[in-house]
Curated annotation (Swiss-Prot):
ADP binds at G157, V158, S159, R160, C161, G162, K163, T164. The keyword Coiled coil does not apply. GO terms for molecular function: ADP binding; ATP binding; phosphotransferase activity, phosphate group as acceptor; protein serine/threonine kinase activity. The keyword Nucleotide-binding applies. It comes from Photobacterium profundum (strain SS9). It catalyses: [pyruvate, water dikinase] + ADP = [pyruvate, water dikinase]-phosphate + AMP + H(+); [pyruvate, water dikinase]-phosphate + phosphate + H(+) = [pyruvate, water dikinase] + diphosphate. It comes from the Bacteria. Bifunctional serine/threonine kinase and phosphorylase involved in the regulation of the phosphoenolpyruvate synthase (PEPS) by catalyzing its phosphorylation/dephosphorylation. Keywords: Kinase, Nucleotide-binding, Serine/threonine-protein kinase, Transferase. Its EC number is 2.7.11.33, 2.7.4.28. Belongs to the pyruvate, phosphate/water dikinase regulatory protein family. PSRP subfamily. Transmembrane segments: none annotated. This is Putative phosphoenolpyruvate synthase regulatory protein. It is an enzyme of class 2 (transferase).
Length: 277
């Protein structure tokens, strides 16, 4: 049965982790108004596994009557040849950059070099990542305000404005130690920067959100409560944003942003450097 023309099966294939092909594929496909069904096939390092993927791709074409899209990052020649024999549209996410670099550098690429570079830095990167995650979890949602000298960034805002997922994303993706502190209803009478955070105000950044969006998020967990009421959300946001302006704390509206976008914008305005790739 042939599906509608704006539907595509998408395959991400790699003889490595497939993270590169997935990331670039997502970024490109996000610009088109199509519906996709995607599968990821990492570590396709043998002819046998390549033939299995080839069969799946061909089955997709036979079932839908539409050529699937294959984003691939493969350096093993035999594996690459087999995958390219599939009945699909192909997008070689490595070669599109390797070929121009080969010309500009006047050097031949050495695929195994990538693997050795990765191995050499993996141990240190892993330890940095784990340390950042542990620190961030220990300082989530105002649990602790100890050891703030070790923090890379301190996020402030009302409850449910995106602080926790942003903090964890910064830690997991970039090895950044993030503290997040919520201002709650009881803080509103005399709202100010906590004394423990005051010496580190240069690390502080605020997150805010549209009133309607905050009401919707809070109602998902605490429907029809005072906490989720329009009046309470409006009051908290008004007071917290006022404090941000009064204390000259930069802040960002998260309403229409993904966690990835929030984190990237924070890195940009804070000048923080990514600690890992």
């Amino acid at each position: 049965m042939q599906r509608k023309s704006n539907f595509r099966d998408v395959f991400y294939v790699s003889d490595g982790t497939a993270i590169t092909s997935e990331t670039l594929g997502h970024a490109v496909l996000g610009q088109f108004p199509i519906e996709i069904h995607q599968t990821t096939h990492p570590f396709i390092e043998t002819n046998e596994r390549a033939k299995q993927v080839k069969t799946l791709v061909n089955q997709s074409h036979e079932k839908t009557g539409i050529k699937p899209l294959v984003f691939y990052s493969i350096v093993i020649p035999d594996v690459k040849v087999i995958i390219e024999q599939s009945n699909a549209h192909f997008y070689d996410v490595l070669n599109v950059l390797v070929e121009p670099l080969k010309h500009d550098l006047q050097l031949e690429p050495e695929p195994q070099l990538q693997r050795s570079h990765s191995i050499n830095k993996d141990a240190a990167s892993y330890q940095d990542r784990i340390a950042a995650i542990e620190y961030t979890l220990a300082h989530d949602d105002g649990i602790s305000l100890n050891n703030l000298d070790q923090a890379d960034v301190i996020l402030l805002g009302v409850s449910r404005c995106g602080k926790t997922p942003t903090s964890l994303y910064l830690a997991m993706q970039f090895g950044i130690r993030a503290v997040n502190y919520p201002f709650i209803a009881e803080d509103m009478a005399s709202l100010k920067l906590p004394a423990a955070i005051e010496p580190y105000r240069f690390k502080t950044y605020g997150l805010t959100i549209d009133i309607e969006r905050l009401v919707a998020i809070r109602n998902e967990r605490y429907a029809n409560s005072d906490y989720a009421s329009l009046e309470q959300c409006e009051k908290e946001l008004h007071k917290v944003e006022g404090m941000f302006r009064r204390e000259a704390i930069p802040y960002l509206n998260t309403s229409s942003l993904s966690v990835e976008e929030i984190a990237t914008r924070l890195l940009d305005i804070s000048g923080l450097k990514r600690k890992m790739c």
